[in-house]
Regions:
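Conserved N-terminal entry element of GNAT/NAT acetyltransferase domains
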Residues: 1-14, 148-152
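Conserved GNAT-fold acetyl-CoA-binding loop/helix
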Residues: 20-38
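A short helix-loop-beta-strand connector motif used in the catalytic cores of GNAT acetyltransferases and
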Residues: 40-52, 79
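Conserved beta-strand in the GNAT
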Residues: 52, 58-67, 79
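A conserved beta-turn-beta hairpin within the catalytic core of GNAT-like acetyltransferases
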Residues: 68-80, 90
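Conserved acetyl-CoA-binding loop-helix of GNAT-fold acetyltransferases
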Residues: 85, 91-104, 130
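Conserved GNAT acetyl-CoA-binding A-motif
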Residues: 106-118
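Conserved beta-strand-loop-alpha-helix junction that forms the acyl-donor binding cleft
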Residues: 115-125, 143
């Protein structure tokens, strides 16, 4: 399998959202439109990186790196916000290449750590640990999403 990992371009956004739709069923069409809008912004932001793996023209993988400052870490923290790979042969190779590029990009941007949110699947934890990630406790999240106000 011959593919290339590179920074995403605006012209890739439609193919990226199509890949996300095929690989992760939790997104509905309205959410995918919001994802596309956000990706269009992230392509240009210095505190993010949107990377794609392309095989000829099709996008076969995507990874999103987001940066945030951290006083506790005394620097920037990189977060692997999203990784999606076309299922099938070569998926592990594509995911590995995307992850290596995310690590390189995070280092180049001055990150002290790279974090990834884990699912509850112990097998997934083991896969990340094989790649060099270490368990670092749990996080609590408070949603700041706005909810629509209903009128009576």
């Amino acid at each position: 399998m011959e593919f290339q990992v590179r920074d995403a371009r605006l012209t890739d956004i439609e193919r990226i959202t199509a890949l996300i739709e095929r690989t992760d069923t939790r997104w509905d069409s309205a959410e995918l439109n919001q994802v596309a809008d956000l990706l269009r912004q992230l392509v240009y932001l210095p505190n993010a990186a949107v990377l794609v793996a392309v095989e000829n023209k099709p996008v076969v993988g995507v990874a999103v790196l987001a940066l945030r400052p951290s006083v506790a870490a005394n620097g920037l923290i990189g977060a692997l916000d999203l990784i999606a790979v076309e299922p099938g042969s070569g998926a592990d190779e594509i995911a590995g290449a995307l992850l290596r590029e995310v690590v390189r990009s995070a280092r180049n941007k001055g990150c002290r750590e790279l974090e990834v949110a884990l699912a509850d699947d112990p097998a997934e934890h083991a896969q990340w640990q094989k790649l060099g990630f270490k368990a670092a406790g749990q996080r609590l999240i408070y949603s700041l999403a706005r909810t629509p106000v209903t009128t009576r």
